[in-house]
From Swiss-Prot:
Binding sites annotated in the UniProt record for ATP: N40, K57, E111, D112, L113, D246, A247, E248
Gene that produces this protein: mtnK
The organism's taxonomic lineage, starting at the top: Bacteria, Pseudomonadati, Pseudomonadota, Gammaproteobacteria, Enterobacterales
GO BP terms: L-methionine salvage from methylthioadenosine
Family note: Belongs to the methylthioribose kinase family.
Alphabetically ordered keywords of this record: Amino-acid biosynthesis, ATP-binding, Kinase, Methionine biosynthesis, Nucleotide-binding, Transferase
An MF annotation (GO) of this entry: ATP binding
Protein source organism: Enterobacter sp. (strain 638)
UniProt protein name: Methylthioribose kinase
HAMAP family, per the entry: Salvage_MtnK (MF_01683)
Amino acid sequence: MSQYRTFTAQDAVEYAKQFGGLDNPSSLVEAQEIGDGNLNLVFKIFDAQGVSRIIVKQALPYVRCVGESWPLTLDRARLEAQTLVEHYQHSPQHTVKIHHYDPELAVMVMEDLSSHKIWRGELISGVYYPQASRQLGEYLAHTLFHTSDFYLHPHAKKAQVAKYINPEMCEITEDLFFNDPYQIHERNNYPAELEADVAALRSDDQLKIAVASLKHRFFSQAEALLHGDIHSGSIFVAEDSLKAIDAEFGYYGPIGFDIGTAIGNLLLNFCGLPGHLGIRDAAAAREQRLTDIQELWNTFSERFQALATEKTRDAALSVPGYASQFLKKVWTDAIGFCGTELIRRSVGLSHVADIDTIKDDAMRHECLRHAITLGKALIVIADRIDSAEALVARVRQYS
């Protein structure tokens, strides 16, 4: 049995030779550490011609951006690998392929996506992938439907819930989404110029009650196997292609959480675009984001309902009209969770480049305020926004 050790670049090369599944493993000669996230080491493995062939990812036993003072379970590597393997079974065209994983070393070997680019960077630059939102909707529909009560036998579903219990990573989400932004906490991160805006979050009882309701659903609604962190930085895109990666927050939770997180990141980009592009280009890109949001939800809901009509196994859940009713609740959840994503990415520990890389301080602060104001509104009035078109109208109202 393997014993955990932190990989060096050479360790990653040797591991890729053994478990990468390549026809000519001896061609692998060099590794480059490319991880820019908070939790892991990520190595690109190159052959003698300088071509990247495979990826080796290893979990660290602490939060990288904080240090060893914030320890983390290594079991998250198993949960991430198993989540991606499960999602790949249901949406292979939109999920990164895992070739091998070792739970003792907390390491996995996965396909190289050098032909793709991280969606967040492309969104910031104003590069438009018209298929991406629809493909993300397809990914979410297939992965969430096929791991839900609509499709799984009750015994299998309960076994899956137990298999994917992920308490330490869920606790991070619970703190960063639902606790920290609404109290004074050392993890919070925002400019002094926003102190009044953040203080208003802490004093808004109506908002905090709505956030408590969302947190309660996150605690208790084991509806499907979530990706758990499906933002534009955990999605790779290319022409006519989209792949989800980075699922260490995977667990059984409310379907609306994945939908809301995805929509929230599109709205964070919407808020930040005036700080990156000229007036006309920013306005055009903002319209694209609003179209993306509508296409994401409409694709997801149409595909989920089609799958429910075709494949639902439970007699009660297969009653005509129930899937549509269920999705109305998912949508309301999604709007609320979307709002928490907007707020926590503006005042909490982990921000997004869509806003944080804006060079002009005044513009950056204005974009942060926009995200906070929009997030508050969506959380509080989620049950009054009954469609993607209604959401777009609300976003325009707060722009």
